[in-house]
Design a protein with these regions (language model features):
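Enriched for short, Lys/Arg-rich terminal
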Residues: 69-113
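Amphipathic alpha-helical interface surfaces
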Residues: 6, 30, 34-37, 57, ...
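Short, solvent-exposed polar/charged micro-motifs at secondary-structure junctions
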Residues: 15, 59-62, 107-110
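Short, contiguous, well-structured surface segments enriched in hydrophobic/aromatic residues
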Residues: 33, 37-53
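A short, surface-exposed loop/turn module that caps and links secondary-structure elements
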Residues: 46-69
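Arg/Lys-rich, positively charged N-terminal/basic patches that mediate binding to nucleic acids
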Residues: 1-38
């Protein structure tokens, strides 16, 4: 599949393995997991090919994240992306964000308590 990056820091992480800005610094294990996810997207001919990688835990997101899908980088981070199918039925993947899901889970826990 073809892969594009919505934000510059995501492209830098893929190309250089690090970012120049101080806001988006990640642990080396997170970066290697991110690279593994991007390579899986690049090697897949279609979205269904991602199901064979059980460790990536591919899923379509629901609720306020409807329209996005995700791959699990590790227990703490996930890679969110948008699947775009063009007129010739080819899928383009636009990588949107690298999310720390522990923050999201703790916020939901606070709201539901």
């Amino acid at each position: 599949m073809n892969v594009e990056f919505e934000k510059e820091y995501l492209a830098e992480l893929y190309e250089k393995g690090k970012t120049d800005d101080k806001k988006h610094r990640f642990h080396p294990q997170i970066i290697s997991g991110y690279l593994k996810c991007v390579k899986a997207l690049l090697n897949a001919y279609r979205i269904e090919d991602l199901y064979q990688y059980k460790s990536l835990n591919y899923e379509k997101l629901k609720g306020d994240k409807k329209g996005l899908s995700s791959l699990r980088i590790n227990d703490q981070y996930r890679l969110e992306f948008r699947e775009i199918t063009n007129a010739s039925n080819q899928t383009l993947v636009e990588i949107c964000s690298l999310i720390d899901i522990t923050i999201i889970i703790s916020r939901n826990y606070e709201y539901n308590s």
